[in-house]
Amino acid sequence: MKRPATRTFGILTSGGDCPGLNAAIRGVTKAAYWRYGMSIIGISHGYRGLIEGDARLLHPRDFDGILTRGGTILGTSREKPFKPDPGEKDSEAGSRKVEAIIENYHKLHLDCLVVLGGNGTHKTAYLLQQAGLNVIGLPKTIDNDIWGTDVTFGFHSAVDIATEAIDRLHSTAHAHNRVMVIEVMGHKAGWLALYAGIAGGGDIILIPEIPYDLAHIVHHLQTRQQRGKEFSIVVVAEGALSREESLMSKEERKKRRKKNRFPTKGYEVAHLIQEATGMETRVTVLGYLQRGGTPSPYDRLLATRFGTAAAELLYRGDYGKMVALRDGEVVAIPLGEVAEKLKTVPPDHPLIDTARAVGTCFGDGV
Amino acid sequence: MKRPATRTFGILTSGGDCPGLNAAIRGVTKAAYWRYGMSIIGISHGYRGLIEGDARLLHPRDFDGILTRGGTILGTSREKPFKPDPGEKDSEAGSRKVEAIIENYHKLHLDCLVVLGGNGTHKTAYLLQQAGLNVIGLPKTIDNDIWGTDVTFGFHSAVDIATEAIDRLHSTAHAHNRVMVIEVMGHKAGWLALYAGIAGGGDIILIPEIPYDLAHIVHHLQTRQQRGKEFSIVVVAEGALSREESLMSKEERKKRRKKNRFPTKGYEVAHLIQEATGMETRVTVLGYLQRGGTPSPYDRLLATRFGTAAAELLYRGDYGKMVALRDGEVVAIPLGEVAEKLKTVPPDHPLIDTARAVGTCFGDGV
Amino acid sequence: MKRPATRTFGILTSGGDCPGLNAAIRGVTKAAYWRYGMSIIGISHGYRGLIEGDARLLHPRDFDGILTRGGTILGTSREKPFKPDPGEKDSEAGSRKVEAIIENYHKLHLDCLVVLGGNGTHKTAYLLQQAGLNVIGLPKTIDNDIWGTDVTFGFHSAVDIATEAIDRLHSTAHAHNRVMVIEVMGHKAGWLALYAGIAGGGDIILIPEIPYDLAHIVHHLQTRQQRGKEFSIVVVAEGALSREESLMSKEERKKRRKKNRFPTKGYEVAHLIQEATGMETRVTVLGYLQRGGTPSPYDRLLATRFGTAAAELLYRGDYGKMVALRDGEVVAIPLGEVAEKLKTVPPDHPLIDTARAVGTCFGDGV
Amino acid sequence: MKRPATRTFGILTSGGDCPGLNAAIRGVTKAAYWRYGMSIIGISHGYRGLIEGDARLLHPRDFDGILTRGGTILGTSREKPFKPDPGEKDSEAGSRKVEAIIENYHKLHLDCLVVLGGNGTHKTAYLLQQAGLNVIGLPKTIDNDIWGTDVTFGFHSAVDIATEAIDRLHSTAHAHNRVMVIEVMGHKAGWLALYAGIAGGGDIILIPEIPYDLAHIVHHLQTRQQRGKEFSIVVVAEGALSREESLMSKEERKKRRKKNRFPTKGYEVAHLIQEATGMETRVTVLGYLQRGGTPSPYDRLLATRFGTAAAELLYRGDYGKMVALRDGEVVAIPLGEVAEKLKTVPPDHPLIDTARAVGTCFGDGV
C-alpha cells in the first residue's frame, strides 16, 4: 500500500457521552497513524473546542489504555454552531461560530474533520461539509436512532445496563408483589426499551412508536394476576405516548404535561396503574446510569470497526460520509442521506412480534 | 451432639426486601434441619402471612439454589401488626392482628418464630416476645442502621451497587465537565452514602448526621475547579439535612418541603448547586436498584453465618435474641436492647476522617 | 389466527451447555403454549433422555424465571445415538438407541422434536429426520461455528466473559511487565478468540484458521517493547496451529503433542514465547468459565427470537429446519444444509483487517 | 494542625499485584500532600526500582482516577534484595543490593519509605528498618495471610472474583450432572477457598490447614447423590494437602508430586474423585484472574483507610510500623511482630463451623 502525502485530521466527540467513544477514537487514531502515517489533532469538547481553537497534536500513546474506558478523553459538549444562542434574534452568533470553525479548520491545516456523535452532530457535520470542509462521521448514541446504520455504538452497552437494572427490579417486584415501572432513555425511538424490555423479561413495554391505552395495560396486569403472577415489570421509554397524546400537537402535549405533576413519563404510568388496579406500583428512572461505564465487548468491537473504517476513508480521501453497519458489513453513506432523519422502531419490526409471542404487552391491545 | 425432641419453627421475612434474605433463610433452614432435625414452617409475606395463617411445611430442597438469588422466596410485606391501620381510631385492629398471630403461632405448633428484618421488624418481634411468643431475629437492611450489630446483611451489596453507579457517573461527569449528584438510600443513617461515597471517590458526601451548609459545598466545588478539576461527584443520602433544616422541628421540615418543588433531597441539592455555582449539574436517584439482585459474596457469607447462628439459638432454646456481628464475632443480643434504637454514623467515625483525608467534603466546613 | 388441532412437541438440549439455553426453551414453550395452544413434553439430558424415555408434560409455569439463568433446566448430555459406544464392534448399539428414540417419539405422541444444540446435535437431528421423525433445530454454541447462521446464542455471552478475563489480565500484565497468554475455547473455529481478542485489546491473536510462525510473534513483541510497551496480551484459541502443524496430518499432530509436555496450546505458546524472548510469560486457561452464568442481554434476545421462531415453524408444520440469523433476519434452513458443515473464520473476514489496523498480530507476518 | 517541616517519602509496591494497590497509593499520597504538605517520590517496580534509582517526584494529579484501577501505576517486582540471586555463592549480591537501596534512600533525601506488599515485602521492610531506614508498611495480598491484621486489601476482591467463577460453574455442573473442581490461590493459607467456598455454596472445600482424606470426599459426594443432587462443586486451595501429604517432609512431597503427572492440586483432586466415584469430573484453575481488575468497594475503602492511616504515621514520624485492621479499627503494629509470621486459618475458626452447618465437607470426616 502506497502511503499518501502525510495527512492531518482533527477529531472531536459531540453530544451526550456514551460507551465506546474512546474505543472509536482509539480505532481511528491507531489505524490512521500506524497504518497510514497521518497526523492527529485532538479537539476538546466537541464543536465548542473547534470554535475556540482548543486543539492539540496527539500521538497514539495518548490513547493507550482507553479501549475499556467510559466517557471520552476529548470531552464533549452539546454546542450546535449553526443554531443561534437563546435570546439572539437572528443567526449572527451562528454564523460567527461557523466562521470560527472554518478559520480554525484551516489554521490547524486539517485535511478532514472526524466527528463522533448522534443526529445533531451529523446534521452539523453535513452543514460544515456544505460549507466546504471535509468531514467524516461516526454514529454513536445509546438511542440507536441514527438513520442509515443498523446499529450505533453505545446502544448495546446501554441495553446491558438497562437489562441488569430490570433484573434487579425483578427480585424486588417478586418479593413485594409489586408492579415495578422502569423508565429508560428514548425520546422519539423506543429501541432501548424494546431490547432491554425483551432481554429483561418485561411484561409490558411502552415505546413512542406504539401509542398505548391504559385499559390494555390494566387488562394485561389483571390477566397476569389471575394466572398467579402477582408482580409485573413495566419498561417505559421516556418518550412513550398514550393514544390520546399521540393525536395531540406538540404544543398541546406540552401544555398537558405542565398541568400534570409527573416529573417524567414513568411516574405518570406508575401513578395511573396504581390508581386503576390498586396494585402497589413503584417507579425507577434509570437516567444517566445508561450512559456511563466501560463499553460492552460488542460496542468495543463495533466502535473499533467504525474507527478503522473511518481511517480508511481518510486515507482514500472519501469525505462527506458517515460509516455505518448494514447487514453485518461496514459501509460509508453520504452525510446528506443521514442528516435530518431519524430511525425509529417500525411497527412491524420482528422483535415486536417476538416480544408478543412470549406474552409481552405493548399497551395497544394486539 | 444429642438431638433435642424435634422442634418446629416458623420463618418469615418482613420489611423492604434486600440482598441476602434468601441466603439467610437457607442458612437457618439447612442447619436447623440437617444438624438439629427440626421442622420448618415457611410463612408468606411477613407478619401478614402469620396473621392470615398463610404458612406451609418446607423441606431443605425447597431452598435449593437460593443462595445467589435476590429478593425473598417467602415474600415480604410492611405489615406492622401492633399499629392500627390508617383511619382506625384506636388499636382495635392492632390487637385483632396480634391475637391472630398468637393464635396461628399455636395452631402451627411453633416452638419459635424466626424473623428476618430491619428496625420495624425487630420492634414487632420484641412486642411479640413480650406477648409470650418465642422469637429470634436476624438483622437485614441495606441501611445498616440496626442497633447492636456492627453490620447488617444487605448493606454491602447495596454499597457495591451504589459504588458501581458512582463509577458510571464519573465517566459522564468527566466527559461533560458536570457536577453529578447521586441520591442513595438512608433516611436517618448515612452509612450507605458514606461507604459508597468513599469507595466511589465522591468529592462531596452529605449524610443526615452531619448538617451541611451550601456555602461550604460551593467553596469546595470552586476550589476543585481552580485546581483544574472541572467535574465533581456529590453523594447525597436521601435524609441529608442542611444546618437550617437540622434546627427545625419535623413538622416545619415537612411544611418547608411541601413548599419547595423538589421531589427528593438529591434534586434540591442539585438545583442549589447549579444556581450557586453556574456549573451544569445533574441528578440521579438510585432508588429500588439498591435493593435488588444477587447478594455480594460478603453478604452471602454474613447471611449464612447469621442463619446458622440462629439455628443454634433455636437448638439451645435461647429465644428473645437477635443475632449480631461484633468485632468479627457472631453474638446474640436481647431483642429488648435492639428495639426502638437506631444506629447512626457517629460524627467521629474514623471513616469520616479517612474521607476528609483524601479531600472529601461533608458540607460542614471542616 | 386459527388454532390447529392441538400439537405436542418434545424439547431437549444436547451437547455442552451454554448461556441462553433456558431463554430459548422459554421462548419456544411460551409461544407454543399461549399463542398456538400446543402441549410441551420436556425431555431430560438430551438424546439420552429420549432413548431412556425420561420425559414429562410441562406447563409454561415450569419455565418461570428461567430467562436469566445459565445452564439448562432440562439437563444435557453428549449422547450421540448414531455412534456406537466405544468398544462396540459395529453400530448395533447405535441402531438400538435410534430405535429406542423412534419408539419413544411415538409413545409420547410427539408431532415434532425440538432440539437445541451445536453441530453434533444437528447432525443427529438430520439423521433422525431421515429416519422419519419431524425435527426442528436451534443453534446454540459458544463457538459460533454452526454453518448457516450468522451467529449462535451463547457466543456473545462467552465473548463477554472472555473479554472481562482479558481486562483483568491487563492490569496484572501491566503491573509486572509480563506477557500474559490466555487460552479460550475454539478447536476448529477462532470466532471467540477473534472477537474477545479485539474487544479486550489483545496484542496477538492466534486462531486455527491462520497458522502462526513463532518468529512473527517474537518480532511483534519486541517491536512493542521498543515502543515502550513492556507488556503484552496474547489470546490463543485452543485449536490454534503453527504453520508447521498446519501442514501435518491429524495423526502426526497428535503424536507430536504427546511428545511435548504441554497440557494445552496456551501452555505451549507461553513456553515458546518465554524461551525465545526472555520475557516473563504466564498462561491462563479460561475453560469452563466460558460456558456458565447468566446469558448476556444479546443472547437472551437472540435465544428468545430463535425460540419464538421455532414455535412458529411448529405451528406451520414446517419441519426439518434449523432456525438461523442471516443479515439480521431470522430464517429457517434445511437441516441437510447444516449437517456435516462447519463455519470457520474466513481469512478475509473484515474483523481480521480491523484487528490488524489497530496493531494486532495474527502471527502470520502480514 | 501545625505542619511539620516538609517531609519527603518514597513509595513502592512489591510482590504480586492485587486489587486495591492504586487505591492505597492514592490514599497515602493525597493525605500526605494535601493534609500534611509532604513531598512524594514514586519508585518503580518495587525494591528493584530503589536498587536502580528508578524514582521520580510525583504530584497528586499523577494519581487522578486511579481509585478504581487494577494493578499498580508504580509497577511491581518480586525483587528480594536480601536474598542472593540464584547461582551466587554467598550473599555478596544481596549486600550489594541493600547498599544500593540505602544509598538511593539517602540520595533521594527520603524521610521514610512506604512499602505496599505481602509477607515477603514486610520481611524486607523489617530488615531495612534494622539497617537504619525509616519504613512504613501496608498489608496487601489476595491471600489474607499477613499476620497482625484481620484482613488485607485485595482479599475481598479476590473472594468476589472466585465466587463469581463458582457461580458460573454451578450452572455447568447442574446442566451436566458433573463434579466441578475449582482451584483457587492459597499455598499455605486457605482463606480465599474458605470465603469463596461458602459464598459460592461449595459442597466440598479443601484448605491447607485441614488435611483431607479421599474417602470422606467420596462419601460426601455419594451421600449428595443419594439425596438427588447429581452435581457438586469442590473448591480447592492450591496448597491443600491430603492427610498423607501432611505427614511428609517438604522434600518428600516435592518428590511425590514430580512422580505424579498432575500440573496442580486441583487436577489431582479431580482425577482421584473421578476414579473413585465414576462421576464425570472437570477442573478449572482460576489463576491470574484472581489478581486483576477493579478493586471491590470493600477493598477501595480498606485501602483508602490504610493509606490515610499510613500518611498519619508519616506525619507523626511513627516509623517501623505496618498499618493493620483489628476488630474494625486501624492500628499500627511493629514490623518486627509481622515479619516471618503467617496468618493461617485456625481449625476452630467460626466460618468452618458455619460451612459445616450448611452441609459443606472439608474432607476430614467431621
Swiss-Prot record, chains A, B, C, D:
Q: Which reaction does it catalyse?
A: beta-D-fructose 6-phosphate + ATP = beta-D-fructose 1,6-bisphosphate + ADP + H(+)
Which residues of this UniProt protein bind substrate? T141, I142, D143, R178, M185, G186, H187, E238, R282, Y288, L289, Q290, R291
Q: Which UniProt keywords apply?
A: ATP-binding, Cytoplasm, Glycolysis, Kinase, Magnesium, Metal-binding, Nucleotide-binding, Transferase
Subcellular location field: Cytoplasm
Residue segments, region Disordered:
74-94
Cofactor(s) listed in the protein's UniProt record? Mg(2+)
Site, Important for substrate specificity: residue positions: G120
Q: Which InterPro entries match?
A: ATP_PFK (IPR022953), ATP_PFK_prok-type (IPR012003), Phosphofructokinase_dom (IPR000023), Phosphofructokinase_III (IPR012829), PKF_sf (IPR035966)
The pathway it acts in is: Carbohydrate degradation; glycolysis; D-glyceraldehyde 3-phosphate and glycerone phosphate from D-glucose: step 3/4
Q: What processes does the entry annotate via GO biological process terms? A: canonical glycolysis; fructose 1,6-bisphosphate metabolic process; fructose 6-phosphate metabolic process
Q: Give any GO molecular function from the UniProt entry.
A: diphosphate-fructose-6-phosphate 1-phosphotransferase activity
Q: What is its EC number?
A: 2.7.1.11
Write out the catalytic residues in the record: D143
Q: What is its main location?
A: cytoplasm
Q: Name the HAMAP family for this protein.
A: Phosphofructokinase_III
Its function? Catalyzes the phosphorylation of D-fructose 6-phosphate to fructose 1,6-bisphosphate by ATP, the first committing step of glycolysis.
Of which family is this protein a member?
Belongs to the phosphofructokinase type A (PFKA) family. Mixed-substrate PFK group III subfamily.
Protein name according to UniProt: ATP-dependent 6-phosphofructokinase
